[in-house]
Amino acid sequence: DASGRIARATGHADGEPLEVSGRLFGLAAGAANTAALLLRSGIANSSGLVGTRYMVHNNTHIAAIDPRRTNDVVFQKTACVNDFYDDMGDGYPGGTLQLIGKVQASMMKTHARRAPLSMLKPMAARSMEWLVMTEDTPDPANRISLDSQGRITVSWTRTNYDRHELLLAKARELLKGAGYVAVFEQRFDISMNSHMCGTAVAGDDPRASVVDHDCRSHDHDNLYVVDSAFFPSSGAQNPALTIAANALRVADLVPA
């Protein structure tokens, strides 16, 4: 409206036009769609930073195989190693190693199409799977934008990948030292789009950020962004609990 506040949101639901009016608006569509909604609406972007600093973590899936024993686990995602999170031994941070859900032979075949299931089944039965996660750093060139039809486009290149390579090497060393003679890797690229964050960065300076430290838009005092878009950096952990904790924090600050 004339005062700069958001008066209503319009869209479609089940093919029908929809309009919602309100006193306060909270946006939590995920970092990509939050940026797209703001860009399509032409709001909250006096800084020109909406959509920039897109981050998705540097991730690699590892399958480690020990031919001497089978892995009969049901719920494998039960452990996380943070020994290298703050320091990789060189004074600089690394990341986290975490168990992930048990991989089956049919899942392996999607990445090894020519391999017969008769070979993959004993491999899957003797494998243990880990996720190696390190921080990707915010780069203004990594961004969400819209094409001429208003569709989302992603511009992205890896950042801070040397730290990822170091943690991968450490993971291989540890696993082989524990008797896992074969270690296979699947490096995630942008198609995985994991843990997206950072497209509506928080900060105190309206010229250098989209929302303030309470996740309120610098441009519209009744608009809050409460998903991972506000992240100034990505860290090297799953972001869901941080998103939830911050949303609860912001909810307590919103005027009743």
Q: Over which residues does each language-model region extend?
A:
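Glycine-rich loop(s) and the adjacent beta-strand/alpha-helix scaffold that form part
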Residues: 1, 9-75, 227, 246, ...
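Alpha-helix N-cap/helix-initiation motif
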Residues: 18, 23, 160, 236-243
